[in-house]
């Protein structure tokens, strides 16, 4: 059955190699490629990369170093770990050296470095710079070996011990705070939040919709998760002003609240292409020749730390598959639901998808087919059910009284009550 289904439906797989989009053609006017990211000819640079990093470089920034030093804490949190460790070590070593020099100068001015002098020293057992440096370390780290200690002979030495103790506490608080803030950053949480490689455009509830899929690879939830999307493209205003990247919001249900999602299993985000959509006048051919980028954003609070994280990705116009839907990944088992992430990036082709724009579709310039075809989601569900039954030792039926359409594709006789068949327009 699986081999027959492959011939019947066009599958875009991230696990298969090859690029056949430019060479293969099908009845409804577009090809079928098989690659990790299904694209046509590359036509523009990304503003937001697939991994979420912004493809932007800042040049000719005045007083950049001073501005970064003015916000030193944020700078320490944002820099790489290797530089953070360098700052961590330098902060302590330089403070020890500074106060070691101070105690050595106190001993030098008081004459404690003269071994023949019998008067009471400001700091006992400090008769060299090495001894002063060790005393500085013992004071700031409160080691206290007992050989070197400050006396009441020099008030300035007593003051410096107190001052170094305060400075040491400040350094500890700053460095430890920066390290903890860097460790608690939710940036790495984005590694377990994934977007589909391609976006798709297909009919849903009688309307053309732009869709993409998001998934959470962890069992821990993303609290208050919500999605946003923007279309980026260049344009020229009526006054002749050129805007290199005009940002246009794409409605994903903000007004109705459906932009807030419960991200336990992969969810398909839907943008209805209506009269307020920037894609309203674009047909399949227009999408093929368009030059724009759709930035998708997923935001939410990490359940473990309650810190807000933001995961980003983008789709160029050549990464939008017209007339495709995503393969189902959620299957119902006896006592639980199963998510198959091997199907996460895969799509299948819907042959009767209109190629016109949403405007032409709304103005009845394109007549939708009323033919009822067997829905691919139902076939995948039946296949999953058949595999589970075969594992449990349930024999397949040998009845030949099957409908002609299902008989051609070797459909197994599976009870349909738990999984009622749905028409393609009902998905």
Swiss-Prot record:
Keywords: Cell membrane, Ion channel, Ion transport, Membrane, Potassium, Potassium transport, S-nitrosylation, Transmembrane, Transmembrane helix, Transport, Voltage-gated channel. The chain crosses the membrane at residues 82-106, 157-178. The gene is KCNJ2. This is Inward rectifier potassium channel 2. One of its GO terms (cellular component) is T-tubule. Coiled coil: none annotated. It comes from Canis lupus familiaris (Dog). Residues 107-128, 148-156 are extracellular. A motif (PDZ-binding) lies at residues 425-427. Gene3D superfamilies: 1.10.287.70, G protein-activated inward rectifier potassium channel 1 (2.60.40.1400). Residues 129-140, 141-147 dip into the membrane without crossing it. Residues 384-427 are annotated as: Disordered. Residues 1-81, 179-427 are cytoplasmic. The keyword Transport applies. Belongs to the inward rectifier-type potassium channel (TC 1.A.2.1) family. KCNJ2 subfamily. PANTHER family: INWARD RECTIFIER POTASSIUM CHANNEL, INWARD RECTIFIER POTASSIUM CHANNEL 2. SUPFAM superfamilies: E set domains, Voltage-gated potassium channels. It comes from the Eukaryota. The record marks 172 as: Role in the control of polyamine-mediated channel gating and in the blocking by intracellular magnesium. Homotetramer. Homomultimeric and heteromultimeric association with KCNJ4/Kir2.3. Can form heteromeric channels with Kir2.6/KCNJ18. Associates, via its PDZ-recognition domain, with a complex containing LIN7A, LIN7B, LIN7C, DLG1, CASK and APBA1. The modification S-nitrosocysteine is found at residue 76. It is a multi-pass membrane protein. S-nitrosylation increases the open probability and inward rectifying currents. Residues 181-208 are annotated as: Polyphosphoinositide (PIP2)-binding. A motif (Selectivity filter) lies at residues 142-147. GO terms for molecular function: inward rectifier potassium channel activity; phosphatidylinositol-4,5-bisphosphate binding. Activated by phosphatidylinositol 4,5 biphosphate (PtdIns(4,5)P2). GO terms for biological process: potassium ion import across plasma membrane; potassium ion transport; protein homotetramerization; regulation of monoatomic ion transmembrane transport.
